[in-house]
Each structure stands twice: as structure tokens, then as C-alpha cells.
Amino acid sequence: NSGCWQEGEFVTKDQCAFFSRGRGQSPRGLRFRDKRPDYIVVDDLDDDEMCRSEARVREMTKWVKEALFGCFGGKEGRFIMVGNLIGKNSVLQKMTDSDTVYTSTVYAIGKDGTPAWPECYTIELLRSRERFMGYRSFQKEYMHNPITEGAVFQERWIRWKRMLKLRYYESLV
């Protein structure tokens, strides 16, 4: 029996096995015959509710790094994580913060003002969605730029430096 793709497990004619697991389900012990996973894809792991909880993001990041990444076989495997960056506190953000992770970001509208996927979206459609959704929501859902409501300054604008000795300042507020 080659399984059923609708149930999340199947094997192709050339003996390539596919297994699906939901967020938080244990992948430990996953194998097909004597083979362990060598290719893992995670899609849209984050959601708004999770991003509001530092503890949940921390726990899910731990699950990805331990349970998921730990189920690779002895050889190097490929790990792909796709999704929109919907929160600064998110599993996707935590993963991309690692210097060992290669990141590719595709914005719905490129710097040149053209859609990244013109076969699906026209610039008129995207601008219409932006008008309907509002700037902040559009930035979050399409441009990987989660803007915290009420935030005046973007974090990337702030430059941190070691403070000089107090005698070098004329006044401080």
C-alpha cells in the first residue's frame, strides 16, 4: 500500500516517502524503511495569536529546532521555512535571526514598483488591497514588515552606542 496523500502519508512509485505533520506534532522516529527525513518544509507556522505570546513563540521555535531539525538522518538535510513575516515576535523571525540560515525575502511589490508575481497580481490589484486593508495590515501581510500599532520609530532607525562619560554632555533630559 502506497498510502494516501489526503491522509498525509504516501510513497511514490520511485520510493520517495512523504509525511505531513501539524504544528507541534511529534516527528520523532519518522522514517521510511531505513531512511530518515532529508527534506523538511514548514509553511505558515506563525499566526497572530502565537505572535502575541513570547512564551508560545519560544516554545514553537524550540519545537522546530529540536524535534523537527532533530529528525534529520545522518546526512545533511534541507530545511525550508516559508511564510509571511507577520510579527517581530515570531518563529520565522527567530529562525531568520540565526546567522546559519539563508534567507530569501520576496515582497509583493518590488522596489521598482512591480508585482513579484505578475501572473497572479497586478499592481492595481495590490494597491486596491492596500487601500482596503490599510497600510499597516498590507505591510504585514504582503511586505514582510510588521508594524507595531502605536510605534512611532522603526527599530532599524535607532542606533545604539555606548554612552559617553557624563562630563561630556552639556545637559541631559
Indicate where each model-derived feature is located.
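Conserved nucleotide-state-sensing and coupling region of NTP-binding domains
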Residues: 1-26
